[in-house]
Amino acid sequence: MTEQLNTSQKRAVILLSGGLDSATVVAMARAEGYACYTMSFDYGQRSHAELHAAARVARDLGVVEHKVIGLNLNGMGGSALTDTSIDIPEELGEGIPVTYVPARNTVFLSLALGWAEVLGARDIFIGVNAVDYSGYPDCRPEFIESFERMANLATKAGVEGNGFRIQAPLQNLSKAQIVQAGVKLGVDYGLTVSCYQADDDGRACGKCDSCRLRAEGFAAAGISDPTRYF
């Protein structure tokens, strides 16, 4: 998917999973005047519905190019999202959840960084937010800040003074605030899929942590959730 590019426009690479948060981030970057290049990953996750959702969102929000990178993270295992022998939990537990994928955001941001350097983009957007902090170590502000420092040490562009910024505009927002922001920016949340185990038609289980957080966010925002359930 490639749209017409205004060559004078600043460029951004945006991690797009196909879920609520990343779709909102694409809309935010677009509203800030960026030419948006989105990157998704087929990494061996349980549900491929999110990849179809990412393509729909990219098309609807008019990104310049949408790229899907294939990775075999399920070959390593270690997560309920990539290993079907590990059950998706239906209750919140203590500590880091089994839905944590080892080093996932580090890997994803590294590949986004490579594409950004090729494109001459200086901004990389990711949809991590306050809801994720307690459970996922690679969603914390300290991680984002550290990755940005690394990006500017480890790249030709960074060494030559054309530094990168890792932008996490949802970092201090609740799920309700994210939904409200997206609605104002015209995000069609009916195109998105948040469920960890959505079926091939994108219908959600309504039981996993991601489904519950999404439903609670829409309810708190006072906005109808367009999620379909199986």
Curated annotation (Swiss-Prot):
It is an enzyme of class 6 (ligase). It comes from Pseudomonas fluorescens (strain Pf0-1). Its EC number is 6.3.4.20. One of its GO terms (biological process) is queuosine biosynthetic process. Disulfide bonds: none annotated. Pathway: Purine metabolism; 7-cyano-7-deazaguanine biosynthesis. Belongs to the QueC family. ATP binds at L16, S17, G18, G19, L20, D21, S22, A23, T24, V25, V26. This is 7-cyano-7-deazaguanine synthase. It catalyses: 7-carboxy-7-deazaguanine + NH4(+) + ATP = 7-cyano-7-deazaguanine + ADP + phosphate + H2O + H(+).
